[in-house]
Every structure is written in structure tokens, then in C-alpha cells.
């Protein structure tokens, strides 16, 4: 038995896979790359309406890439996250705007101290609808006062195969308590959320 979480993306979970708890047949998927995936994964996991977040590798040229090869820059992959979300609770456009403030989209091939093409900024879209939404959000953010004089370098591409990262990368911040590069307060403010509004489960 298979569960389709996004018919447009043809994303399926086989029976026996870890289906996100509470996932509905019409849940959707978004893909985002914004530096080290540990922090990006954690940032998205806090949002109500986000059902599951997986760290992985995307937009590369090698099947089943491994962390060391990705870090060496030989596979062409970006560290990205797959976000499974309930569109009735949180819209794709809101996720895009949150993401643009979660990391620094003006840094080319790096985030904070992490440097390399694997740390590039990107939104990888599924279908024309997501592409148009992401394009509009990027345009609005670029025109905002916060980014005056700063050029956004986030790449906007059709999503290629997403490869889940090794198990030890999943939920890394939650498991270790380490601090990462993301700016969660700024991202929440950008979408009109207060940290106090986040449920205890997030």
C-alpha cells in the first residue's frame, strides 16, 4: 500500500515507511536549501502545520550521495530539507517567506562559517504553482526594506531527486542541543508569528 502525499509531485510513502504522524492524503511537500541542513530542519520543524521535516541532499548529479562526498563538492548536491506540510494550516508561500528570513539569502555558496556549493541557498519547486508562488515571494522579499542594497542569490529550480541524509543528521539540533546559523526569531516575525504561539509539540 502506498500513501500519496502530493499527487503533483508523485511523492509516495511505501507501506512500512515512516509516514509522518497526522499526514493527510492531500499534504504537500516543499524543498529548501539554506546552508547546513541541521538548522534549517529544526527551524521548519517548529511551525504548526508542518508534519515532517527530513534532512537530505538535492540538485546533484550522483545517485545516493553520502555526506563526505557532498561536503567535498564532487556531487553537485545542496544540503536541503524536505518539508511535508498541511496546506490548510500553513501555505507554501508562508513557508517560502519564513525560509527567506530563516537564513541569509544574500550569501553565495555559504552560510555563516560554512562555505561551499553544498551550502547554497535554494528553493526547489514542485510544479508550476509552487514556482510562481516562490518567484513572487522572492520578488517581494527583495523589494523589502530589510534587503535594500543586498542582492538575494537564492536559486529557484524545479526539484530533482531528494536523497535523505544519513540517520545521524536527522533531528540533529533537537538531539544535541547545538546552535546553528538560522535566525528563528526573525523568520517567525516575518510571517507574523510569536515564539509564544508555538505549541509545546513544536
Give the residues covered by each predicted segment.
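Flexible coil/turn and secondary-structure edge motifs
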Residues: 1-202
Amino acid at each position: 500500500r502506498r500513501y500519496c502525499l502530493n499527487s503533483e509531485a508523485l511523492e509516495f510513502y511505501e507501506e512500512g515507511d515512516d509516514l509522518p504522524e497526522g499526514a493527510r492524503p492531500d499534504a504537500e511537500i516543499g524543498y529548501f536549501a539554506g546552508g547546513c541542513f541541521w538548522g534549517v530542519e529544526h527551524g521548519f520543524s517548529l511551525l504548526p502545520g508542518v508534519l515532517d521535516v527530513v534532512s537530505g541532499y538535492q540538485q546533484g548529479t550522483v545517485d545516493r550521495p553520502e555526506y563526505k562526498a557532498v561536503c567535498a563538492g564532487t556531487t553537485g548536491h545542496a544540503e536541503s530539507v524536505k518539508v511535508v506540510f498541511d496546506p490548510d494550516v500553513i501555505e507554501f508561500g508562508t513557508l517560502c517567506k519564513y525560509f527567506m528570513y530563516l537564513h541569509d539569502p544574500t550569501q553565495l555558496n555559504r552560510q555563516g562559517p560554512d562555505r561551499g556549493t553544498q551550502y547554497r541557498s535554494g528553493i526547489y519547486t514542485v510544479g508550476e504553482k509552487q514556482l510562481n508562488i516562490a518567484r513572487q515571494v522572492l520578488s517581494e522579499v527583495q523589494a523589502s526594506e530589510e534587503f535594500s542594497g543586498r542582492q538575494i542569490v537564492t536559486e529557484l529550480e524545479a526539484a530533482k531527486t531528494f536523497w535523505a541524509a544519513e540517520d545521524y543528521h536527522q533531528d540533529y539540533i533537537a538531539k544535541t542541543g547545538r546552535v546553528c546559523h538560522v535566525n528563528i526569531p526573525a523568520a517567525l516575525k516575518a510571517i507574523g508569528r510569536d515564539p509564544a504561539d508555538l505549541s509545546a509539540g513544536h
